[in-house]
């Protein structure tokens, strides 16, 4: 009898241990979705009031939105190279034909005009989303934002054709550590100093305004990706983004506007052919972390 009881106890213990292991395996199994949720966006009509950094950020945005199922896409970009908030205000108020106006309606960027006024771009479409940004040399200098930011917001509010248009702030990126850009001297030629300056400027000067419904944290997504195996290699000249950097920035914009976590890179364009599977994992990680923590660098696991 004692022998039978002992055998029964051994059996029960073994079964319990096995069941426990099975439960543990189930609990720790990776349940991360392998596909993105269906897009919440039926259309995207975006105008960037920017410079060459908005060109970088929007280069692949059409391809991404189309791959995710957005049905109507119209992108516009009012560009003056190196344009600051101060200069945008001056050109907007004067009506000077100072802008390159670029537009993408079919998946190809076209230069509509090389002598456009601010109003021509602003009033060309009933834009749903309008983005603003600061020139990179002064993007991390909080004292260079006002009064120009408020003046630009007021001008756009008074002249936009869609009363329901929403404003987003484009947080740009710090220069590559070996950049030779003259504006890098504003940050003692240190990438970390520039990044922290950008964060500080946004917290001090952009967030207190009630005009912006959100931040497009391209700068933090780029900084996150720099902590991965990719390293500090995301520009083509020390400050303008290369292909991978442009994809990261564009996915940051898309993920913010879609309002859902990113799980898979679906871009279907020439840009995607240069991306490895490991690159795509870094993009997903960097973008999601930037949206969750827009003012903090998140160390990559890759």
Which residues does each predicted region cover?
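Bacterial signal peptide processing site
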Residues: 22-24
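Conserved SGNH/GDSL esterase-like catalytic core that processes O-acyl groups on lipids
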Residues: 56-146
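N-terminal module-boundary/linker segments of secreted carbohydrate-active enzymes
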Residues: 30-70, 270, 283, 293-302
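Alpha-helical cap/lid subdomain in secreted, periplasmic
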Residues: 116-239, 243
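Positively charged n-region of N-terminal signal peptides that target proteins for export
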Residues: 1-4
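Short hydrophobic segments within beta-strands
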Residues: 47-49, 78, 170
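Conserved catalytic region of serine esterases and O-acyltransferases that act on ester linkages
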Residues: 240, 244, 250-302
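C-terminal motif of bacterial Sec signal peptides marking the signal peptidase cleavage site
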Residues: 16-20
